[in-house]
């Protein structure tokens, strides 16, 4: 589900230094469309920030 993918993507940021490249997040889930929806919704919801090819936790 999209919710599952959102959780996996956030886990990558939480388990690291709070930032990850788009390529690193691409490795989390094989379905590019579903992963893209999840990333977009996380950014729209303010739970993730995108700067260039990197994503990070807000703040």
PLM segments and residue spans:
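HhH-family (HhH-GPD) DNA N-glycosylase catalytic core used in base-excision repair
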Residues: 1-59
